[in-house]
Amino acid sequence: MRARSFYSNLLFSLGLNLIIKPTAIFIIDAAVQNEVGSAYGLYFVFFNLSLILSILFDLGINNYSTRLSAQNIEVSKNYFSTVFVLRILLMLIYILGIVLLKYFVSISWTEYKLILLLGFNQFFIANISFFRSYFAGIQRFRLDAFFSVLDRLLLIFSMGYILYLLPDGHKLVSIESYALVQFGCYLLSFVIAFITAIFILKPSLNQIHLDRILPILKDAFPYALLIVLMTLYTRIDAWLLLHYSIEDGVR
């Protein structure tokens, strides 16, 4: 029975991802690229940079939460509020980093707003993944699968309406508007995931133990190291190309 349930959940997750994610890539993302042209390259650079900086939001906490909730859900619930507060503190550090970035990197105000917006998007993504780690830990795999595609599903409906149904909607499409629509989709997904996590897990929201933050970071460090190395390896090339093109006066 357990094996049947496992394969059923696995097929459900694979089915959702095979339908929703390719649709978002080929129907929405590709259409936006065609509309904005070369400006999408700038979006890609800042998306990669925001992804690198999003390491601050995770630090291996999601993998740590999945393991902890699978081992002892009651202990994991007690850590919920503490970890969430930790994420807010890391978000403040990230904002400070973005503010300092403006003084060390030659970017325009429009580009600065774009990277800030994409950074907030990564913050919502990281927290949605955090909630999903609890759902996976308590073996609510269908719920985990649903929230893995909810933001893209919302993006398909919202950007799909602008691109294909709204008269002259293509005139509204720009890198800034695309990032803004993504922001709305991630924000809504974050709110729904947060409410669902509170309803299902019923964590102790009033139990915030700041003295547990350092032990949590210490336990999550092995996961964080893997994330840091893989993210830098796969994402830093676009930012380096932009940096050197600015120095050479190409851009």
Task: Describe the residue ranges of each PLM region.
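Helix-loop interface residues and adjacent transmembrane-helix termini in multi-pass membrane transporters
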Residues: 34-37, 108, 137-138, 172, ...
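Signature of the first transmembrane helix
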Residues: 4-62, 95, 121, 156, ...
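Hydrophobic alpha-helical transmembrane segments
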Residues: 112, 116-119, 146-201
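Alpha-helical transmembrane segments of multi-pass membrane transporters/permeases
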Residues: 10-19, 77, 116-120, 135-161
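Alpha-helical transmembrane segments of multi-pass membrane proteins
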Residues: 52, 56, 92, 96, ...
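Transmembrane-helix boundary and interhelical linker motifs in polytopic inner-membrane proteins
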Residues: 2-4, 35-39, 53-86, 136-142
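Interhelical loop/hinge segments that connect adjacent transmembrane helices in multipass membrane
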Residues: 1-6, 171-179, 191-234
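Alpha-helical transmembrane segments of multi-pass membrane transport and lipid-handling proteins
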Residues: 18, 22, 57, 81-108, ...
